[in-house]
């Protein structure tokens, strides 16, 4: 017995040690699995920075997230790896890490619920990133999380999960909006709008609590990006989450934004008013007066997109106020007063008036049937053709026509198909000309009033084409409004057929006069053209004579070497018409290009003096003046003037004339083999380099001359080509752009180049082209000064200049707050 007891006691510690060893082995294996999993994730994340392995790494990461076991211990490891990689220097790694955060939450909804606040806070912090792709990834991640978690799902205690989670999203976003960082404020506002739009079952009550905070931000002078926050109000309106108690303050803030100096903010305010009118019309129905007053005050904005949004907002708010319906009764009163005037003059047939009254009564019944038909009727009656009652075109002509005819004219009335009349058969024997002319007039006039008389037909004669086009456009709208098939009932009498021959004779007479005038005009134009060709040939002869004289004088004074300036001035203007009288009226900058010596600057100034001292206005020599004095015909004088202007722009063609080339070669030979004009040589080399696709050499040739006119012409000709330039040439071009920003006539060219500079900097990094810090600050400072003095062109389609300034400064990590001081 004692031995058995001893054996049992000896077995107990052995069993305990075996259990401990099993637990320790399991712990070691799980720890090794965690280490291996973390290593796989970090390896895949590091491969995201390479474009060749990017897609492979994305697939591997998604497989890892899907394949890991559903364990609470796994999620912290994944989140830790993704949080650390979000601060990586490479933009693709940061974008994919943020996307994987939302993908992880979608894959493990229950496990990630406890970590949701930490995940949202981390995503909001990433909004400070200068890369637009990272901020877009943050916006999409917030939208995915909102679609997954913001659902009106009731739990056991009667509360709703979606309503309680709105605070987790809104709190970090509002905190980000409170910071004095423009990109962070804008990104947070965009994320909040995405959160509201993406909610599957929007918790309206929780969303309504956001309105007071949003109104406070709109009224705050410290909140800069109001254009990004205003669409959030529109999103709240779309889901019906506008709090009635906050509506007054929101409208007041929106009205103030309509007068903002930033046109993007003004357009956003107009779009929000449209959204409120469409989705929250019941709330704003009794607050239309102040909004209409604000819209009327700024409806004539100088920016076209803003004007369009303001006009649309004004229309929808007028419809809510009920001011659009008054047009229907006013138009009906105008029609009734017209008929009464015609009845007093004895020119309206009683039967036609009765039928017209039936048509108007039927139309009024149709209008009262539904609100949709009322809105359609308002549009139709508003766009009807103007009444041609005042015969102010040619009163004597219409008086003669009235004396020839009687007061009875054929009248057509449009009736519904159920009121058919057998009188349709009476119109089949009428002539084709009579039927077509009568229907084209009476149909158009019956669509607006129902009945018109002969006098109105004659008043419509002079404006026949314009009225027919307007009426044809309104015919389809009228048919859609009536909804019934209509037919024309025509009552005609035989005694009225005698009224048409005089009218036809008048028409034929007018056609003959028009043909005669056209023939005279063609003869005159042909003679003028021949005279201009002859005059151009004579002027070219005069030019050749003047050039011969100039060449002989330059040969005689060749020892002094100053006669070549005339050739230099002409050659500079020959190459392109854009570098002549039609070029930009800018002053040549006297800036000194880096690397240019004082001798080159003195040569440039001497060349500019030579250009101004030998300017010759061709076409005004002694021969041209004698031709001018001898001519008495005004057309010939006009032709001489136009030919004289064309001579100034025809210098570019004279370069290709064989005689001019021979004269230049002969002049070069007489000068003893001297070199040609350096400006001409550099520009020719630049054009040749552009033709062969060597943009960098083209800019190098032009920049070596130090001539700003040539550089502006080349930049305008090629457009933004920073991605085709080397680092040295790119820095020279950027330096020139910084100088040109202070000239408002070159503002559009500079904006296009700065737009491309921002794009290539975002794509290739802030150190692209190795731009010096001083040059970056100079460009940003000049752009900041140009913002306060120059507005962007109306046809500018890129980013707003202030956005360009902020984006460039953010990309280059340069603080722009000190520019305002």
From Swiss-Prot:
Checking InterPro entries in the record gives:
ARM-like, ARM-type_fold, TORTIFOLIA1/SINE1-2
Q: What does this protein do?
A: Plant-specific microtubule-associated protein (MAP) that regulates the orientation of cortical microtubules and the direction of organ growth.
Residue spans of the HEAT repeats:
69-110, 114-151, 163-201, 205-242, 245-282
- Start-end of Polar residues biased regions: 579-590
Q: Does the keyword Flavoprotein apply?
A: no
One cellular component term (GO) for this entry is: microtubule
Broad class of the protein's primary localization? cytoplasm
Q: Which PANTHER family match?
A: MICROTUBULE-ASSOCIATED PROTEIN TORTIFOLIA1, TORTIFOLIA1-LIKE PROTEIN 1
Protein name per UniProt: TORTIFOLIA1-like protein 1
Q: What is the reported phenotype of gene knockout?
A: Right-handed twisting of petioles when associated with SPR2 disruption.
Any coiled-coil ranges, and where?
501-554
């Amino acid at each position: 017995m004692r031995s058995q007891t001893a054996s049992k006691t000896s077995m107990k510690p052995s069993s305990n040690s075996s259990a401990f060893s099993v637990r320790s082995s399991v712990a070691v294996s799980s720890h090794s699995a965690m280490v291996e999993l973390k290593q796989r994730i970090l390896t895949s994340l590091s491969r995201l920075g390479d474009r060749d392995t990017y897609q492979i790494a994305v697939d591997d990461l998604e497989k890892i997230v899907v394949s890991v076991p559903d364990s609470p211990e796994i999620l912290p490891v994944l989140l830790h790896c993704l949080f650390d990689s979000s601060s990586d220097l490479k933009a693709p790694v940061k974008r994919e890490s943020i996307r994987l955060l939302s993908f992880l939450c979608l894959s493990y909804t229950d496990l990630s619920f406890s970590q949701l606040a930490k995940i949202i806070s981390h995503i909001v912090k990433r909004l400070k990133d200068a890369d637009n792709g990272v901020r877009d990834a943050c916006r999409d991640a917030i939208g995915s999380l909102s679609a997954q978690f913001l659902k009106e799902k009731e739990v056991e205690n009667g509360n709703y999960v979606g309503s309680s989670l709105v605070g987790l999203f809104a709190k970090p976003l509002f905190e980000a909006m409170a910071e004095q960082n423009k990109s962070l404020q804008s990104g947070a506002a965009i994320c909040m709008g995405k959160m509201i739009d993406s909610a599957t079952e929007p918790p309206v009550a929780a969303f309504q609590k956001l309105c007071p905070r949003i109104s406070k931000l709109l009224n705050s002078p410290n909140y800069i990006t109001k254009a990004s926050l205003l669409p959030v109000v529109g999103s709240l309106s779309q889901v019906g989450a506008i709090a009635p108690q906050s509506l007054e303050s929101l409208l007041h803030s929106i009205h103030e934004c309509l007068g903002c100096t930033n046109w993007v903010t003004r357009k956003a305010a107009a779009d929000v008013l449209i959204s409120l009118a469409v989705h929250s019309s019941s709330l704003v129905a009794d607050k239309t007066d102040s909004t209409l007053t604000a819209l009327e005050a700024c409806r004539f904005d100088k920016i076209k997109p803003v004007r369009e949004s303001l006009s649309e907002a004004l229309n929808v708010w007028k419809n809510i106020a009920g001011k659009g319906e008054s047009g229907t009764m006013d138009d009906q009163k105008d029609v009734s007063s017209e008929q009464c005037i015609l009845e007093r003059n004895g020119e309206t047939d009683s039967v036609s008036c009765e039928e017209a009254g039936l048509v108007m009564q039927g139309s009024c019944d149709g209008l009262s049937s539904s609100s949709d038909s009322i809105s359609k009727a308002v549009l139709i009656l508003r766009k009807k053709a103007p009444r041609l009652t005042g015969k102010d075109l040619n009163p004597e002509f219409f008086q003669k026509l009235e004396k020839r005819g009687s007061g009875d004219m054929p009248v057509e009335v449009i009736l519904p198909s159920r009121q058919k009349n057998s009188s349709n058969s009476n119109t089949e024997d009428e002539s084709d000309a009579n039927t077509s002319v009568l229907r084209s007039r009476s149909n158009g006039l019956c669509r607006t009033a129902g009945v018109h008389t002969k006098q109105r037909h004659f008043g419509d004669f002079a404006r026949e084409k314009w009225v027919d086009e307007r009426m044809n456009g309104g015919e389809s709208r009228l048919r859609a409004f009536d909804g019934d098939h209509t037919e024309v009932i025509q009552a005609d009498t035989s005694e009225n057929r005698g009224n048409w021959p005089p009218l036809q004779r008048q028409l034929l007479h007018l056609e003959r006069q028009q043909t005669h005038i056209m023939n005279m005009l063609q003869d005159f134009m042909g003679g003028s053209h021949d005279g201009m060709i002859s005059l151009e040939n004579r002027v070219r002869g005069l030019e050749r004579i003047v050039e011969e004289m100039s060449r002989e004088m330059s040969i005689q004074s060749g020892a002094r070497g100053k006669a070549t300036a005339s050739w230099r001035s002409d050659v500079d203007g020959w190459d392109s018409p854009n570098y002549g009288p039609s070029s930009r009226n800018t002053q040549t900058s006297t800036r000194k290009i880096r690397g240019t010596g004082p001798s080159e600057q003195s040569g440039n100034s001497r060349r500019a003096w030579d250009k101004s001292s030998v300017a010759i206005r061709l076409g005004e020599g002694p021969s041209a003046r004698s031709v001018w004095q001898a001519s008495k015909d005004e057309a010939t004088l006009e032709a001489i003037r136009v030919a004289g202007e064309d001579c100034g722009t025809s210098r570019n063609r004279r370069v290709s004339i064989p005689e001019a080339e021979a004269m230049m070669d002969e002049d070069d030979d007489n000068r003893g083999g001297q070199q040609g004009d350096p400006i001409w040589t550099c520009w020719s080399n630049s054009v040749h380099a552009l033709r062969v696709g060597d943009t960098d050499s083209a800019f190098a040739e032009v920049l070596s001359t130090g001539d700003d006119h040539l550089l502006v012409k080349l930049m305008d000709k090629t457009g933004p080509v920073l991605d085709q330039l080397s680092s040295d040439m790119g820095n020279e071009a950027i330096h020139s752009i910084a100088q040109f920003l202070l000239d408002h006539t070159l503002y559009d060219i500079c904006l296009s180049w700065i737009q491309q500079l921002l794009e290539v900097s975002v794509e290739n990094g802030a150190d692209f082209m190795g731009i010096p810090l001083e040059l970056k600050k100079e460009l940003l400072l000049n752009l900041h000064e140009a913002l306060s003095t120059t507005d962007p062109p109306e046809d500018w389609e890129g980013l707003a200049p202030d956005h360009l300034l902020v984006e460039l400064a953010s990309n280059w990590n340069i603080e722009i707050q000190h520019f305002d001081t």
